[in-house]
Amino acid sequence: MDVLVPLLQLLVLLLTLPLHLMALLGCWQPLCKSYFPYLMAVLTPKCNRKVESKKRELFSRIKGLTGASGKVALLELGCGTGANFQFYPPGCRVTCLDPNPHFEKFLTKSMAENRHLQYERFVVAPGEDMRELADGSMDVVVCTLVLCSVQSPRKVLQEVQRVLRPGGVLFFWEHVAEPYGSWAFMWQQVFEPTWKHIGDGCCLTRETWKDLENAQFSEIQMERQPPPFKWLPVGPHIMGKAVKSFPSPKALISSFPSLQLEQVPHQPIYLPLRGT
């Protein structure tokens, strides 16, 4: 199988040679940025229809996460066309962030169709650099089908931790790699170099659950889901939530240096994705 992968990758490359040549010459990326929002505007409603009940179950937990303002301050990371707006509870104060400014046209349409929400602003920036958002300013961050295409999931999750208030929650829905060594994983490896160009940087073989485990959340609830479109190579999905920890006792009593605290390795608490 290890020998077969590069041979099949070469075959796919030859079949899609014009695309790879355009990418090499720097012509493909601007074109992709322009057409990708139109592609998502077609695909995301179809995807939502297939996973609607699960999305409603996941995002129903947002309602009880109000902050000091009495409303939920929600950041949608990689907001795309705004396909998730319909699932958010009324009154959320939504900030949208996406590195692709061409999504704004579709966001405006989604905002008009979902007037139960309060929209703050649209920030054009990558998830690795959210400097325009203040520390601890968000009660909730939503990230759906985003960590597959960012340059550094680790840096994105660090930024998520920074903008979340203590006790704030990251809600995620991501596609991940098939089991290592399976035929499905082999085909993901074969298609990935070409798929990254078609899907605006989307990687098929990321083990995103490991990035979440290493991100120092105090609690993680995660559930595995089958892909909504079995004819695509995107593989299984993971959905769930991750809670930002409150300041450690050591940080809270730093003014008392004489007090010695035992160092305990961080381990997130894993719970089934049920209830609120």
Where are these regions (language model features)?
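A short glycine-rich, Lys/Arg-flanked "PGG" loop and its adjoining helix->strand segment in the class I
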Residues: R154-P166
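A short SAM/SAH-binding and catalytic strip from SAM-dependent methyltransferases
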Residues: D139-P153
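Short conserved loop adjoining the S-adenosyl-L-methionine
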Residues: D129-D135, Q151
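N-terminal auxiliary segments of SAM/dcSAM-dependent transferases
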Residues: M1-Q29
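Conserved alpha-helix/loop element of class I SAM-dependent methyltransferases that forms part
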Residues: P45-A73, A83-F87
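Core SAM-dependent methyltransferase catalytic element
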Residues: A215, M222-T276
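C-terminal alpha-helical "lid/dimerization" subdomain adjacent to the S-adenosyl-L-methionine
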Residues: M22-G26, S34-E52, W173-P236, K241
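Class I SAM-dependent methyltransferase SAM/SAH-binding core
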Residues: A73-R131
